[in-house]
Amino acid sequence: MNFLRKIVKSCKDEEDQKPALVSAPPDDDDLWLPPPESVPLTEISGKKNMRNFCINGEVKICSPNGYSFKILRHILKSFDGIYSGNRRMIGLVKVVIGLALSGAPVPEGMNWVYKIRRTLVFQWAESRGPLDGEELEYSQEITWDDDSEFIGLQIRVSARQCHIQGRVWCINMNSRACQLWSDMSLKTQQSDEDKNTSLLLE
């Protein structure tokens, strides 16, 4: 068993920073709950505090025996407490993680890799969000480890403001992305300009 665990841990990239540890999920953690109150559903009509970002996101999952979204969701429920990036862009990072994990993974050795590369439109509430022209290069490893199972979650997100026409991060309210945003406690409020649009509060 120890030999297997050593092999498993070799699928992680070597990182200088110590990965954050997350405790085991409760047995009833796989319930599919309603998403947060409001996410963008249609084209954004209000232009207030709207910014386009060119996004490159990658979520790499290392696990020897496959993995369930039950454990991933449990890990992401602790995201606010373990996030090590720029706090002004944590909402953007949550959106990218949710969208990436809603796509199809590509096997890579003992890893499953989810990638997203697109231009997205974000709107923040007044005085929230990144500073004008601010960019993000965020990388973090989070692990869940006990005597029977190991899962390593590597997250990389780069974001820079760009002038390419972007898409709103609209998605079906019953989608996996919405559930993941709910797990990560994505903070939003309904826009005064457009009832179908949410402003990020983080």
Swiss-Prot record:
Cellular compartments annotated: Virion membrane; Host endomembrane system
GO-annotated cellular components: host cell endomembrane system; membrane; viral envelope; virion membrane
The UniProt record lists the keyword Phosphoprotein: yes
Predominant cellular place of this UniProt entry's protein: virion
Topological category with respect to the lipid bilayer: Peripheral membrane protein
Family annotation (Gene3D superfamilies): Rhabdovirus matrix protein M2
Pfam family, one: Rhabdo_M2
Molecular function as annotated in GO: structural constituent of virion
Region of interest (Essential for glycoprotein binding), ranges: 115-151
Disulfide bonds: none
GO biological process: viral budding via host ESCRT complex
Motif extent (PPXY motif): 35-38
Keywords (A to Z) from UniProt: Host membrane, Host-virus interaction, Membrane, Phosphoprotein, Viral budding, Viral budding via the host ESCRT complexes, Viral envelope protein, Viral matrix protein, Viral release from host cell, Virion
Protein task: Plays a major role in assembly and budding of virion. Completely covers the ribonucleoprotein coil and keep it in condensed bullet-shaped form. Inhibits viral transcription and stimulates replication. Plays a major role in early induction of TRAIL-mediated apoptosis in infected neurons.
Assembly behavior: Homomultimer. Interacts with nucleoprotein and with the cytoplasmic domain of glycoprotein.
Extra remark beyond the main annotation: Most abundant protein in the virion.
Family membership: Belongs to the lyssavirus matrix protein family.
Protein name per UniProt: Matrix protein
